[in-house]
A protein has these predicted regions:
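C-terminal helical "lid" subdomain and adjoining coupling/linker elements of P-loop NTPases
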Residues: 126-134
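Short, polar loop motifs at secondary-structure junctions
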Residues: 34-38
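Conserved phosphate-donor/acceptor-positioning beta-strand/loop module used by diverse small-molecule
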Residues: 43-65, 71-79
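Small-molecule kinase domains that catalyze NTP-dependent phosphoryl transfer to phosphate-bearing small molecules
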Residues: 1, 70-113
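ATP-dependent small-molecule kinase phosphotransfer cores
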Residues: 1-29
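Short, amphipathic alpha-helical "lid/cap" segments that border enzyme active or binding sites
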Residues: 18, 112-120
Length: 134
């Protein structure tokens, strides 16, 4: 039987992040992006899980502009990053990353600021409905 000290460093890092995510959530309202936070908090009440997506061409234009890249380099960067994210998420959660069909928040239509506002408004609305016990 293996012990914590025998674990590969990437597993130790994942467990430390997992614990940190729970500690942050225990301290009060927060926004956590990535790091399998939905998985870490799956047994918590009052959690909102959002997968923000946009069509690839919109993402390419945004990343090309932000990092002053050609569209081809931006697309390559996005695809490599997505592959790493999917591999990490799928490995540690035994779920499939980017199941966007479960969500309906598209930053390609709302933009970054609009998406952030939509999430904030959703949480406020949901809290008001919960408080009213409808």
């Amino acid at each position: 039987s293996g012990s914590y000290s025998d674990m590969p460093i990437n597993h130790k890092i994942f467990l430390a992040q997992f614990d940190a995510i729970k500690k942050i959530a225990d301290e009060g309202p927060c926004v956590l992006v990535g790091r399998c936070a939905d998985y870490a908090l799956e047994n918590y009440d009052n959690v909102v899980n959002v997968f923000i997506y946009a069509d690839l061409d919109i993402r390419v234009r945004r990343i090309a502009r932000l990092y002053n890249l050609t569209d081809a380099k931006a697309k390559d960067m996005i695809l490599k990053t997505d592959k790493k994210r999917a591999s990490y998420y799928n490995y540690y959660t035994n779920k499939e990353w980017a199941e966007a069909k479960s969500y309906d928040l598209n930053s390609g239509k709302l933009g970054v600021e609009g998406t952030a506002k939509a999430i904030k408004d959703y949480v406020s609305l949901r809290n008001n409905i919960t408080d009213a016990k409808l």
